[in-house]
Amino acid sequence: MDLCGFRVGLDRPLFLIAGPCVVESEQLALDTAGALAEMTGELGIPFIYKSSFDKANRSSHESYRGPGLEAGLRVLEQVRRQIGVPVITDVHEDTPLVEVASVVDVLQTPAFLCRQTNFIQNVARQGRPVNIKKGQFLAPWDMRHVVAKAREAGNQQIMVCERGVSFGYNNLVSDMRALAVMRETGAPVVFDATHSVQLPGGQGSASGGQREFVPVLARAAVAAGVAGLFMETHPDPDQALSDGPNAWPLERMRELLETLMELDQVVKGRGFTEQGL
């Protein structure tokens, strides 16, 4: 599949979607995007910058949601112009989709909304590639229906993203078999290595997380075979305004990416023996 000027798939090198969970300030966005663009450029990794202007599904109404549509899009536009990288952001049911699609390169649908048919199709009709996050409540094989809805709206640039599945209360687990199952949709599969270590609502009025397991799950996903990785990162995760407990430190991103790229080359170079069984 063509995506932002590069090809993605199991026959192509790993691509990266990364950035802070939410837009905090223009300077933080530019600094983070610049650092990520520099390291991915040196490593030969296709890169899309991610940040949200509004996090509509925060645990508490008192949690920081973002700067809002106008201010958030202005920051994302500056990232595109000044850093020269494509950008992706979340949209919701009440988002003015045309306005957002005029600024960003890729649209992302939240996991909780993956079953909302009208929403998925409206997003797909905007003429932008779409990254559809699989709900924490959804079986991986059920994503074929979600992809079919999006394609029925006339969009063939659809990706599917695994971000863990609910396991009891306030916990998620990642079943690596899901990555192979989701390939059967024909859409490129992305693994979200940071939300997969989230502990939803685990801090009472906020979600917790176990960022020490980000490299573990990222390595496992790349070994299983994915088109791309999604990782939220922050210069100081403990001070991040959203999802800090599961964000990967920006200063440690390069060393992790180097390992992941080596794994990706080995796995994709040898092929996938499970195919055709």
Swiss-Prot record:
GO biological process terms on file: keto-3-deoxy-D-manno-octulosonic acid biosynthetic process
GO terms under cellular component: cytoplasm
Keywords annotated in UniProt: Cytoplasm, Lipopolysaccharide biosynthesis, Transferase
Known EC number: 2.5.1.55
Reaction it catalyzes: D-arabinose 5-phosphate + phosphoenolpyruvate + H2O = 3-deoxy-alpha-D-manno-2-octulosonate-8-phosphate + phosphate
Pathway: Carbohydrate biosynthesis; 3-deoxy-D-manno-octulosonate biosynthesis; 3-deoxy-D-manno-octulosonate from D-ribulose 5-phosphate: step 2/3; Bacterial outer membrane biogenesis; lipopolysaccharide biosynthesis
InterPro entries cross-referenced by the UniProt entry: Aldolase_TIM (IPR013785), DAHP1/KDSA (IPR006218), KDO8P_synthase (IPR006269)
Single GO molecular function: 3-deoxy-8-phosphooctulonate synthase activity
Compartment(s): Cytoplasm
Domain of life: Bacteria
Family: Belongs to the KdsA family.
Protein name, per record: 2-dehydro-3-deoxyphosphooctonate aldolase
Protein's organism: Alkalilimnicola ehrlichii (strain ATCC BAA-1101 / DSM 17681 / MLHE-1)
Protein's gene: kdsA
